[in-house]
Amino acid sequence: MRIGSYQLKNRIFLAPMAGITDQPFRRICTHYGAGLTFSEMMSTNPQVWHTEKSKLRLAHHQEAGINAVQIAGCDPDEMAKAAQINVEYGAEIIDINMGCPAKKVNRKMAGSALLQYPDLVKQILNKVVKSVTVPVTLKIRTGWDKDNRNCLEIAKIAEQCGIQALTIHGRTRSCMFEGEAEYDNIKAVKEQLSIPIIANGDITSAEKAKYVLDYTNADAIMIGRGSLGNPWLFRVMESLIEKDSIVLEPSLNEKCNVILQHIQELHQFYGVEKGCRIARKHVAWYLQGIQPNPVFRQAFNAITDPKEQLIALEGFFNLILMDKEKNVRTTT
């Protein structure tokens, strides 16, 4: 699959997720097979561009793979300016957020709130596409609510404005993340558009990924919450989708080493206080797929020193690995 001049290595992408898809997490997902990863959402409000959070999100030069950056806002001129600034900092693809359902985003008329105003959508897309030389993509939902599913209308506007690829999450804004994603509307859009369509929503296994691609005939899929604590999912999906073969997840020992590396990179990227704080949620997600332990998690969450976090994790993982070895010996 191509987006603009970029040939992507596969059709399995990491979704932009605020507070999650920072550089360390994107690097790990790229290593484990994500064909394209997107940054956290960047506000187009110039008043926040100089905050520490925005500065970290603007550091595109250390990226692994293609630098795809998502921006969010509602003012066409501000959106265009934000796109230009991100390109100056190294962004190679600009993605426009018109899918976020969060109230704090929608109250500012950004994210999925824009789906209610097709004329404004057209103004924004035209401005951004004309302001940069890199490909511009768009992420939306199927509509504002069940009575206003207008993703086909928005998709046609996007294609007319020069959008290079369109991601559709299979829920309306009013659904938030409740219920199950539906793929009929994604399929309908794909049937009528010529630009690449990326399907998104509730894709948490290789089998589901293959089903969604086959059902919708989408050009690619985008994985969001399914990747939390599970970055190796991309490799498993790629093997089934691209090679029609099953590849095993990494060994427990490899997973433990990856987690330790991830936590160490978070400390280096964010600094002591914030790095330790962000590490806690990632550790919680990782442990869900390895060995949930509320007692250890509570103790880990109380640690405020980076070295002590790593020591605690190493000790916990050593116990898990020792138990596994004992179980193997007793069964053989």
From Swiss-Prot:
Residues reported to bind FMN: 16-18, 70, 139, 200-202, 224-225
Entries under Gene3D superfamilies matching the protein: Aldolase class I, Putative flavin oxidoreducatase, domain 2
Active site annotation, chain numbering: 100
Cofactor section: FMN
Keyword Flavoprotein (UniProt): yes
Keyword Zinc appears in the UniProt entry: no
Keywords: Flavoprotein, FMN, NADP, Oxidoreductase, RNA-binding, tRNA processing, tRNA-binding
PROSITE patterns attached to this UniProt entry: UPF0034
One GO MF term attached to the UniProt entry: tRNA dihydrouridine synthase activity
Catalysed reactions, semicolon-separated: a 5,6-dihydrouridine in tRNA + NAD(+) = a uridine in tRNA + NADH + H(+); a 5,6-dihydrouridine in tRNA + NADP(+) = a uridine in tRNA + NADPH + H(+)
Annotated signal peptide: none
EC number assigned by the record: 1.3.1.-
Protein's job: Catalyzes the synthesis of 5,6-dihydrouridine (D), a modified base found in the D-loop of most tRNAs, via the reduction of the C5-C6 double bond in target uridines.
Family: Belongs to the Dus family. DusB subfamily.
HAMAP family according to UniProt: DusB_subfam
Protein name stated in the entry: tRNA-dihydrouridine synthase B
Source lineage: Bacteria, Pseudomonadati, Pseudomonadota, Gammaproteobacteria, Pasteurellales
